[in-house]
Swiss-Prot record:
Superkingdom, natural source: Bacteria
Enzyme class: oxidoreductase
Protein name as annotated: Acetaldehyde dehydrogenase
HAMAP family, per the entry: Ac_ald_DH_ac (MF_01657)
Keyword Oxidoreductase: yes
Encoding gene per record: bphG
GO molecular function (one): NAD binding
GO BP terms: catabolic process
Family: Belongs to the acetaldehyde dehydrogenase family.
Keywords (A to Z) from UniProt: Aromatic hydrocarbons catabolism, NAD, Oxidoreductase, Plasmid
Residues that hold NAD(+) according to the record: 12-15, 163-171, 291
Keyword Zinc part of the UniProt annotation: no
Assigned EC number: 1.2.1.10
Pfam families linked to this entry: AcetDehyd-dimer (PF09290), Semialdhyde_dh (PF01118)
Length: 313
């Protein structure tokens, strides 16, 4: 039987529980070692215990007291941005080389979008998975920017309010800041902006994302082909990821420029509009929670690629 590397998950909420189920069902080089929470009555800890996973409700300090801690190579942090900074610092005092997959917007490590720059950070000790909205939309900004220079990229992520637990709600400000920055650093836009909408509709609506870019004029066919190719790449690990409709284009001529606050008062170029839908795999919450699925799938894919390199060394 092939050797697998053990992982702990900090945060027994929606994201952590969904990720745990993915690892238990689909882990190739990664296996569950421990589930860590702070609420002894949490559903995530109860599920983990039923599935035979070591648990603690005493937070990251409780993790270090578990027998399995000595065998942990990976830690997925699904808490909050502020908590992640402390968790990383604390664990490194005991295991300096531990690999941290940051599922919060803390971003103390490099941003990682698997289909865009995942191969660039396989040796990093801490990688940041940006946000659910970033994982869905930044590949599309990158798809445009590999064809034409993108001056501005704006994304709107709409997720079901029911899929947003207390950790997500506590991170709203960090969500917009981290996603906006990653649109620039990873997506290639000169200026990025991110907006998140928690939709309270009942029954809950599926995750929807809209991406707008303003770029230099370029072949619309080339951009559309690049977008479709990128969507297929994301579908390799998030099967429910899809383009909702054909890519739309508007030519903004220099004779009729537009004003983009923070970018320029007289902007012209090619406006590209991309409409996405992300259906979840329903490993934990129902299929409307595509935001969980894309975040946990990206985190697991990144860890699997890191583990492949570590096991081959």
């Amino acid at each position: 039987m092939a050797r697998k590397l053990k992982a702990a998950i900090i945060g027994s909420g929606n994201i952590g529980t969904d990720l745990m189920i993915k690892i238990l069902r689909h882990g190739q080089n990664i296996e569950m070692g421990a589930m860590v929470g702070i609420d002894p009555a949490s559903d995530g800890l109860a599920r983990a215990a039923r599935m035979g996973v070591a648990t603690t409700h005493e937070g990251v300090e409780g993790l270090t007291r578990l027998d399995v801690f000595k065998d942990i190579d990976f830690v997925f942090d699904a808490t909050s941005a502020g908590a992640h900074v402390k968790n990383d610092a604390f664990l490194r005092t005991l295991k300096p080389g531990i690999r941290m997959i940051d599922l919060t917007p803390a971003a103390i490590g490099p941003y990682c979008i698997p289909v865009v720059n995942g191969e660039d950070h396989l040796d990093a000790l801490n990688v940041n998975m940006v946000t659910c909205g970033g994982q869905a939309t930044i590949p599309m900004v990158a798809a445009v920017s590999r064809v034409a220079k993108v001056h501005y990229g704006e994304i709107v992520a709409s997720i079901s309010s029911k899929s947003a637990g207390p950790g997500t709600r506590a991170n709203i400000d960090e969500f917009t800041e981290t996603t906006s920055k990653a649109i620039e650093v990873v997506g290639g836009a000169a200026k990025g902006k991110a907006i998140i909408v928690l939709n309270p509709a009942e029954p809950p609506l599926i995750m929807r994302d809209t991406v707008y870019t303003l770029s230099d004029f370029a072949s619309e066919d080339a951009i559309a082909e690049s977008v479709e190719r990128m969507a297929a790449d994301v579908q390799a690990y998030v099967p429910g990821y899809r383009l909702k409709q054909k890519v739309q284009f508007d030519r903004i001529e220099a004779s009729h420029p537009i004003n983009i606050p923070g970018v320029g008062p007289r902007m012209s170029g090619l406006k590209t509009s991309i409409f996405l839908e992300v259906e979840g795999a329903a490993h934990y919450l129902p299929a409307y929670a595509g935001n969980l699925d894309i975040m946990t799938s990206a985190g697991l894919r990144t860890a699997e690629h890191m583990a492949t390199r570590m096991l081959a060394a």
